[in-house]
Every structure is written in C-alpha cells, then in structure tokens.
Amino acid sequence: MTSLQRKLPEWMSVKQQEDRIDDAKKSFCKKNILEDNLPFMKFNGSIVYSYESNDCSLLSEDIRSSLLEEDVLGFDIEWPPVYTKGKTGKVALIQVCVSEKKCYLFHISPMAGFPKGLKRLLEDESVRKVGVGIEGDQWKLMSDYELKLKGFIELSEMANQKLRCKEKWTFNGLIKHLFKEQLYKRKSYRCSNWDIFLLTEDQKLYAATDAYAGLLIYKKLEGMDAHESDSFRVGREGVADCKGVKRQLTDLSKGLMDLVNQVPNSFGCYTEAVRAVDILEDLSEKLEELRNIMKEASKAEGNGLHFQNSEDCSKKDKSILHVACKESLAEHKMDCKNADSQNNKDIDSCQNENRDEDFFMTLGISEEELYMMEREDDKKQTNPDYKLNKDSCDTNEEKDMSYVIESDEDFDSEIIKSLEDLDNSTEEALGTGVPQAGLIPAKSVDTVADEEEDEGIEEEDDDDDWDPSMPEPSAQHISCLKTYFGHSSFKPVQWKVVHSVLRERRDNLVVMATGYGKSLCYQFAPVYTSGIGIVICPLISLMEDQVLQLEMSNISSCFLGSAQSKNVLQDVKDGKMRVIYMTPEFCSRGISLLQDLDNRYGITLIAIDEAHCISEWGHDFRSAYRSLGSLKRMLPNVPIVALTATASPSIREDITKSLNLHNPQVTCTSFDRPNLYLDVARKTTNISIDLRQFLIKKQQGSGWEFEGATIVYCPTRKTSEQVTAELIKLGIACGTYHAGMGIKQRREVHHRFMRDEIHCVVATVAFGMGINKPDIRKVIHYGAPKEMESYYQEIGRAGRDGLPSCCHALWAQADMNFNRHMLGEIPNKGFREYKLKMLTKMEKYLNSSTCRRKIILSHFEDKQLRKASSGIMGTEKCCDNCKTRLICNISINDTEDNLQDFGPQAYKFISAVDVLGQKFGTGVPVLFLRGSTSQRVPDRFRNHSLFSSGKDQTEAFWKVLARQLITEGYLQESSGQTKFSTICGLTSKGSNWLIKANNEQCPSLLLPSNNELCLQRTRVSNFSSAQAHSSMVPHASSNTRSSMPKAGPEKMELKDKFSYQEAERLSKAAGVSKSSFKLQTPCKLSRPPEPEVSPRERELQTTLYGRLVVARQKIASERDILPAVLATNKVLVDMAKLRPTTSENMKKLDGVSEAKSAMLAPLLEVVKEFCIANSLKVDVFSGSVSQSESTFFTPREQERISLPESQRMSYSLFQEQNLSLKKIADVRCLSMAVVGMHLWQALKAGYSFDVQRAGLTPEMKKLITYAIKKPPINSDLSSFKAIREYVPANIDGYPIRMVISLLEKEGSSGAQGQPEFPTQKTLIQTEENPKNVSVQNTKHKVTMGKSMWIEKKPTQPATAELEVTKGKALAPIMLASWNEASLDADTEELFSESQSSTTRPRRRLPEWFGSTKGNAATRCIQESKNLGEEKGSFFD
C-alpha cells in the first residue's frame, strides 16, 4: 500500500486485533444511555446572523470588549461538502456562542474577504475558545485563510481529564453522556451548502446549537467536582444484559408492525411525509449499526471471550467511546470534513488528530460498507434530480429565536432571499438555460418598465380635510393630546388610525413616511384610555429614546429586553406602565405575561413597529417577527397596529397574513419628504474646496461651521478620515465613524453627536442604524451612492423634525467605476446583476437634468406612495434641477431642447457590441471602434467594416456614450464568467432600435444632454463648430462649485450648475434681473413667517434662536438627555417668532406638553431678557396684540394677505418672471386651470397682475359681467355655482372667479366712500364741483410692482370741465354693493331707461364696453349705443 493510497482505520489493521477485541469487550460493559427517545438539545437564545464584513468586524470587537477573564466562547465552523477528489470546501460559517442566551453566526462566504475584526478575535490568545475537534478546526482555518486560531481548549481532552478516561469523544457523544440529551440533526442541512447565501432557519439553528453545546460541555466539566466526576466516568454503568436487549428488540419490532398498519394511502400528500422518510432512513442506519454490534459480539464469544461482570469490563483504563456508535453515519462532522480530508493529502496530514476524523475511523462498519457509502455519494452527485430532491426535503419550520443583524444596505436581504429561491427553483434544477450573454427576456421587460416607471408621478391632494364620514376628535381628545404630547391637533392619517383603534377596535396596517408621526398613532390610545399599550420594536436604542421622551411627558413607560438594567417587570405586572416596549424575542416568550395584563387591566392595543421585518421579502427580515402571528390567536379582542415606513403591496399582504390581522384598515402616506432639498454636483480632488460651499462663517471667532447638524457619508474608511482631517483644519468640531474603529470610540462619537457636542459626523454607511436625531440639517454624500434604496434611507435621516433640510451628493465618474469594481466581489451572480442594475439607476439619477424627486419616487412601485407632496414639485425647494429651470425659464416639456442627436455614433457602438457577440464589457467595443491593436480585440474581428470606424471620436467620448446608452436602457451590463468581469449586451429596446436603424440611411437617436458627452463631442468637432460654441464650453466644463463658502443661501454660480445645453439658455435669460425673482433657500432653518416681518425683526429672530439653542444645550447637559428630546428645533423656531414669556403661552407652541413646559421654563427668561434689550414685542400670539404693534409693516403691505407657497410660486413666475400660464403649467407639472386658480387666489389676496394676460380677455369679462347683472343672478355674487350655470361652458372657472373678485373689490371701495388706496388721489378736482367728479376721467394701470399700485394719469385739461349729473337721476343699480361710488353714463344707460342728458367728456372707455366681436349676447349689449373708437382697459 503506497503513501498515496487512503489510510485504513485502526480497527481494520491486523496489528490492532487485540485492541479491537478489548474494545468489543468494553462495549458490553457500558450502560446503554443512547436511546432514540432522548430529548433533543435546542438553543433557545437569540441568534445574531451577520453576512457583511463591516458588521462582522463591529460585532467581533464588541465581543472582545465585553468578555470577562473567566468567560469562554463556544466555537465551531462549517463548510460545504465537496466530493471531488483533490478538492476541499472552504470554511463558510464561523459560530461563536458567548452565553446561553446569545450566539453569533458569521457567514464568511458572501463577504469580500475575511473580516479583520473577527480575525483579531480568533487570534487573541486571551479569549478562550472551546469545542470538540477544535484543533482540526485550527488547521482548517490556517489552510483556508492563513489564520492561526489561538487560545482554544479541546473539550475531548478536558473530558478525559475530568472523567479520568481516554475516549475519543464527539459533540453528540458528550452531550448524550453528560446531559442525557442528543443533538437534533437532519441530512437535509447537516451536509448542506453552507456557502449559499442566505442560510435557512434550520441551518442557523443547527450551527448555533453546535457552538452552544460546546459552551455547555465546558461549563459542565469545569464545574464538576470529584464525586460528580465519578458518577459520569465511562465504564461505571451497569451491564446491558442479554434479556434486556432482546426485550427491547421485541418491543421495537412490535411497534414497527403496528406502524405499518397505520400508514394511510394518502400519506404522501401530508406535509410531514418528507420528515417521516428521513426518520426511517436514520432508523435503518441505526439498525445496521446494531446488527454490526451483534456480529462483533458473536465473533468475540466464539473466540472464548466471555465477560462475567462490569468489573471485568473495566480493568483497563483505556476504553473506546461506544456512546457514539449509534450516531448517523452521515453526520456533518463525520461526512463533510472527512470527504475533504480523504481527498487532500495536506489537509489529511493536518487533521489526523481531528476528533471527527478519528471517530469516523472507529465506527463499527466494514470496508465494504465504507465503499458503498462513497458509491452512494458519487451517485447522488451525478443524479440531476439530487439537488431538487434535497431541497424539497428541507422543511421551512419557523424558529423564533434568531434575528438578522441590521445593516444600512437594508434591501440586500430581500433580493438575496428572492435570488436564493430562484436558484432553488424547478427550472434551474431541470437545467433550464439562459440566453447568451445573460440576456434574459424578463430583464428586457424590466428595462422597458424602468423607462416608463417615472411616469405618473403626480402631486398628492391636500390631506388637510377630514373624512366627512369620520367624526372629528372631541375636546377631551385634543386636551389629552396637548397635555401629554404638546400638539393642538391630529394629522388626518393619525386621527384615522387612533379613531379606528378607540371606537372600532379594528386592526390597522399603517405605511407612513419617516417624520410623519407614526409613534403618536400607538402612544395616544393607551394614554387616553389609561390602559396599556404594547409596542414591539426591533432596536433597543429606539426603544430607549422613545421611553425617555414619554417619561419627560409624565407618561409611565419602560422597555423589556436583554438590555434592560432596571427591575421594571414588577411594575409592569402591577399595571403601572401605560406604554411597554419589548423586543420581538421577548414577546415570543412572554405571551402569558400579555394575557395576564389583558385579563387584569386590559390592553388597549399592540403596536408592531418596523413591521416590514415580518415579511421574508422585506428589506430587513427578522425571523422572530414571524412568531408574532400568535398574538392575534392569543388576544383576539386586542387591536393590532402594524407600522412601517416602507412596504410594497406584496409585503403589506404578507404582513397581514403573517400577523393574522382581521379586516385591517390599511393607511398609506406618500414616501415623499417635501422638506428635503435634493442637490447633485461634481466633486474635485480638493476636499476642502468641495465642502466649503456648505459652510458659513462662525458668528464669534474665526473658522467655519455647518448650518446645523450634518452627516457626511464617504465610500471608504480612508476617505472618511481624509475628510475629517480637512474639516478639522477649517475649525469644525467633527468626528469619524467607521467599522475600523473600536466599539468605545464609535459609541463616544455617537454620544457626542446626539448631544450636539459635535455638529458633524464623517462616516461610512455603518453610521445611522437606529439613530434618532430629528434635527439633522444636512446629509452630504462625498462620493457616488451605490443604490437608490440605501440613498433614500441615508438622506431620510435629515429633517425628521419637519424643518427644511438639504441633501447633497458630490460625485465623480471614478466613484461609479470604483463601485462597479467592488460589485465584482459579490459571489452570487444573480445578486451581482441586480446590484449592477441598481448602480445604473443611481448613475441615471446623478446625471439627470429632470426632477430628482420624481426619479426617487419612481423607484417605488406603489402609485400611492409615489405621489409627491402638494406644492413642492417644480419649485426652487424641490431640487437643483427644478431650481435651474425656474431661473432660466426652461419648460419641463421642452425635452427637444435638452436632447441631442447621437444617432450615428450610437449606431456604431451598439453595432460593435452586437458584432462582438455581446461577450465583452464596454472597453473592447471602444478599442474595436478606435482600431486599436490591443490583444483584447480578437483578430477575427479586425477585418470587419466597423473596425476603426470610430477614430473621429476620442476614447473618452465612446466611454461616456457607452455609459449613457446603458443609463437610457439601450444596453445593459450583466455578470461575466468571473466575479470581476461584466458583459455588455443589448436590451430589447436596444435591439429594436438597431433593427430600425439598419433600414435607415441616417439613424437618429436623441439622448439627454450630458456635460461630459457634449464636452467630449465638442473637443473633436471642426474648428468652426468649436468657435460657434466656444462661449458654451466653459460652462459645460465647469463641474465644480464655487470654492469660497458663502454665508447666504446661494450655493454656486449659475454657470457652474448648468449642463452643456443649458448654458445657451443662460445667455437668453441674462436680461432677467436677479431682484425680480428672489428664491427662497431650502436651507433655512425656518420657514418665512407669515405675514412677512421686517429685516430688523428677522435678524433679531435669528439671533434669539441661536441663544435658545445654547440655553437648550445647557439644560440638556444638566439633565443628561438629548437636546432634541428636550425641545426640537421647530419649537425653538416658534419661540423665536412668537416670543412667549409665560408658561401658558409656552404651552400654545406645537410640541410643548405640560411636563415639557416646566422643563423649558429657563428659556422664557432668555426670551424676556433678549426682548427687553432689543425693544422687541413679546407674546406675539393671534389676538394678543394688534398687527401694527407686533410687526413693522408699511400701510401698503398691510393690504396684502399672505399666500400659500404653491400659489406664491405661480404668482411669482407669472408676474415677476413674465411667464405665460402654459409655461408655468409646464414648469410646475400642473394644469392651466390650477395655475389660473392660483392667480385668482393671488388677486383675491390683494396681489396685482395683468388679468388680460392671465386669460381674462375684455370680451370674456364683459360677457361674465353681463351674466352676473341680468336675472336671475341680479348681481348676487354669493353663489359661484349659480353664476357658473349662466356662463358659457367653454369658459374656465378661474376667469369667472376673477371677475367676481374684481366686482367685489369695486363694490367694497364704493361702499366705503373713500379711495381704495389712500396714498393715491382718485378724484379729479374741478373748480365747479370738486367733490362730485367721478373717477372715470382717469386711466387705471396695474403695474408690475409687489403691491396693487394704481397709477392715475389726468386726461387733457379740455375734457376735465364736466357738467355733473344730479343725484336724483342716478340709476337704481347704484345701490349694488360691487359698484363704484359713481359710474359713467354709458354704464348706467344699460340698466336704466330714463337717463338725464349729460355732456360727456372725451375719454377712453373700458375695453369690455367697446368690443364689436364676441357672441350674440355681447352684440346685443351694443345695439343702443355706438361706442367710441378709442378703446381702453382698466387693466392694460
């Protein structure tokens, strides 16, 4: 037998025959404790499952820092089986059990590399690791990862020392011997594919139990005294006599025969049939082992080896472990690891001492049986149905003791879960292939869907109106709301949920955007009813913050979980707590507690926060949530409220079914965050210059600071440290946060940031999990985000207090290349392709010139969730692109102006991709078109007609064009054969276009103007073209912002913001004065107060706000609470505006409860002192003081009523930017009717504009006026609906409302008997009768000023001498409320048959009297009078 041949077990060697006989003798001396009916050992603690490198390192560091000297770790590893000779599976999973209640599973296989934090933990000699066969695990880790495991303790050796024996133990053997239990193991997952992501719940439980068992064994052996050691010694048990064995076999055979008769014909359809088959297989193997034992016993008896008693059997100290002879031969630690060791010589030599290797060779099986096992394994591997059958045997029993560790890449879990199911599907098992180059038809459909997914994004209706079918909250509701929560009213959706719980006792599913107020939906009801509210929350940090806020409002509350250091359980049982928070794991084990509370005190509701964790398709699945479905069965009369900030329709349906909700009320709000301003710009290589634009000068001292709390996200740790260094140079107090830091350092940074000790954190995406800081004003991404899901979550951490906040993204093309390269480290091909698709979508967002809010909302599949907030889209507060369009008067529908034709170039590139067989990335087609001699271009393509056809363009141009074609969906990237390669192929959209282009002489393809694309094209254009566009190139090439920071809201020069095409528009709009349209910055800490205040008062408000912030920080530090919990920034803003000086007035502020008003009492003194020092009015509440006393208005400003934001924007565009209604409708994505209504509201509020340009022509005005004056209306302006019926249907509603408003104004001024505007004279003074001359001798002109100024120009002196009519001759219509004090004779003649003759002056008549065009009604008015030739208008 050569050295290359497999070693034979010791029991097959002739030299060891005597030892085998002794072993057989020993086997009959031991008491048989290994019965099949032993209870299974189960791990009932929580399982932390980590599959991301950074999280793994963080958790490992946390384990290291929390361990005491006497603590040990239960340790084990898993790897997939490999049955190919010469190959071994790589370690895929590392299990670490820290206590009987917690176990960590680190899934190494999906990680990019071995986590450094975990490596430090395993190589730390001071941290003791225990396990059976752990020495073999050491060599395995050394072989796979060059990691030397240190500080380990071999439990089999420890057991031999304690029990004073020499056995070869296994996990199961020690468990059975020490605890009279057995490990529950099944073939379907013992030797399963441990490298496949995600692990199943059975796999997690199996792996955790192994590490847990090691920890229990160590504690048992460590605490074992001499007496207990003797009781566990091997060989001390009684004799297994012949009669006893025969009796057991007889009973077993009878039981089996009875089972045969009980098997039903339809047993195969039963859900547990597969499990029964597995049990029978295990039983067959056990019987085979038992048969071998009996054969060995017969041979020993034939050789004269008779055993008299137990003393004879225990003469030798050495004994062989017979306890594990009844173990399954396919046990993972026996099969999987042996398969590797037998096929690899080096690993075999390293693992000869491995406990599993040795035990496998001491089994009571023959060489023939070993050969048969190997044949069976080979047969399974060659069977195409093996994988399908194996997967179908896996059960999906839910376990309630594990949860997935949270990560900021929340959506990964959902996608990987779906891809795993896809990989295990029937199609894959049957070998269904995919089209060449990974072009799956379904993806083509997705591409088309992506192309149109941003359609249908519209503004949501105002939700301020209550549902008429739902009663409004009572005075008691409002009183409770104000007393405990500080609010004066509910939001409509909040009251809808609260009313449903209080009155209808109905289940609810609430999908509510961050910052809308989810917590009030479940906190109010138990406080109002004095009942108990149960809140299930996954994050301990969030529970702690919520409890702190409730306690500050005098609401008794607590949280129950492993992190609770206080003894609050007794208070809970006594019914002293109104709101009780608990983890899902605690809830699963505490159902009896909830039943007791409900029976004794009554549970008002059970709220399940972050309910998307229930769904396996959710982005943060936690299996412990699945057990919450039992709550409805145990407490059927308690309403359940499931809340989440994000859930698709499929996830909502899964939540409803999993929780067993009965006819739930489903409430959804939009995902839009209207207070977030979105901005994207290019970054440079100078970090300081890039970030200075977001800084302002400190008011005191030198240096810079951010405008409020700021998070700067960086793609790598190195970048975050570099950014921190640059900010420190600028004098900014900031901290760094990333996974490479120690746990104490990270906690310190988080603590200081939450308490406003530092105002900026520069972090990787690891920062933000569980953060509850509502006053973050800026979120800056210094580097391109990876995908839309994580980007939406990260920017969602800004502005949770409802105040305006900014989200900036600074990126370069190199960031996208880096992200694309990092995706190559993802081992799962399907998941890697999904990530590529998400990266392409993110690149489209960064490059887009359309509304960025619209792109983000289009990512959500639910139309209700995709709706934008009313009045935000198209305004300067929406995003940088919308702001640019407003400044340059660019219509949102002017797409042709923003597109350029790249048809010939696109045809060449797409054809090149097709010619090359769609087998390469974007680089090879570029080399092919450029005629490169690179070896990357196959020689067989060099004679093609397209080869070197693109020399007229630069390599950079072709690369940019390729990215643009991918972004627009004509090309797509998919994973190549290796992890780091990508393949560029045609989508269905690209294929269809190419077919169409082949039949055209000059193909055309309009692509959105892109800075880089146009710039590269310009560089290679002819000299004349370059000269023609030379004025535009500098604008296009300037991708950076101004390097100097600005204290004001303006962020950058206009030319640096525009794309190549938009630069040309800038020159056209250069004549527009900057002062004519003043943009409201979205970065301000507070909205402009209504009505407008004077500049002096605004400046004082800002100063007072700063002092209040300082005072709040002092109070928070004294009380050791978070400043934002004490008082949000919105409360401080309101205090600066309204300046309360008493506790009662303080309570009037929204968000200030009874309890908080007492805590904030010191702020009242700050307000008093400041107002006295600056002579500023205090307690500026409605009705407390007159308007003139509290503000600094001029008389003309008092005439105007403030407008809502949306109406103000439409008015500004129309009046100050001189845009038409159609243009405004295009820019703001509104209908012309809506814009017209905005202008009518502005007119009604006292704002002036040209109504004729707004669509109210003289003919239309005359027609509407006539309809109002004649019966049956009879000048009654109170009913718009009645007037509408008598106006032609082709006239919109807003012109009618404008006429009504004009007539009301005229009537109001006439009733007062005084000029409408006291600063202007409205009567012409004559010598004869200066008091009775009417206003008709003047020309009224509405100018373009801010207020309705009416310019009066006197007519020619000759026409000013009038004979005034007598009072008795005036027409009766003079008494109408909307007429002026005196009208001209022409007007009176229309309504009165007898009219005194007058000498009329030569003057201009209103234009709507002199028209000869129009309908029959208009012509009828003119029959009795020939109007003057000269026409005029009150509104020119």
Swiss-Prot record:
Superkingdom field: Eukaryota
Q: Where is the HRDC domain?
A: 1098-1177
EC assignment: 3.1.-.-, 5.6.2.4
Protein localization? Nucleus
Check the record and name the InterPro entries matching this protein.
3'-5'_exonuclease_dom, DEAD/DEAH_box_helicase_dom, DNA_helicase_ATP-dep_RecQ, Helicase_ATP-bd, Helicase_C-like, Helicase_HTH, HRDC-like_sf, HRDC_dom
**What does the cofactor field's note say?**
Binds 2 divalent metal cations in the exonuclease domain; in human Mg(2+) and Mn(2+) give high activity, in mouse Mn(2+) and Zn(2+) give high activity. Binds a Zn(2+) ion in the helicase domain.
Gene Ontology CC: one annotated term: nucleolus
Q: Which organism is it from?
A: Xenopus laevis
Give the residue interval(s) assigned to the motif KBM 2: 1401-1410
Q: Which residues bind Mn(2+) 1?
A: D76, E78, D210
Domain (Helicase C-terminal): residue spans on this chain: 690-842
Q: Which SUPFAM superfamilies match?
A: HRDC-like, P-loop containing nucleoside triphosphate hydrolases, Ribonuclease H-like, Winged helix' DNA-binding domain
Biased composition range(s): Polar residues: 1029-1043
Q: Name one Pfam family in it.
A: DEAD
Short sequence motif named KBM 1, residue ranges: 4-16
- Motif (XLM) positions are 1422-1436
PROSITE patterns in the record: HELICASE_ATP_BIND_1, HELICASE_CTER, HRDC
One GO-annotated biological process of the protein: telomere maintenance
Q: Which GO molecular-function terms appear in the entry?
A: 3'-5' DNA helicase activity; 3'-5' exonuclease activity; ATP binding; ATP hydrolysis activity; DNA binding; four-way junction helicase activity; magnesium ion binding; manganese ion binding
Q: What protein does this entry describe?
A: Bifunctional 3'-5' exonuclease/ATP-dependent helicase WRN
**Where is the site labelled Interaction with DNA?**
W139, F980
Q: Where is the 3'-5' exonuclease domain?
A: 51-222
Keyword Iron present in the record's keywords: the answer is no
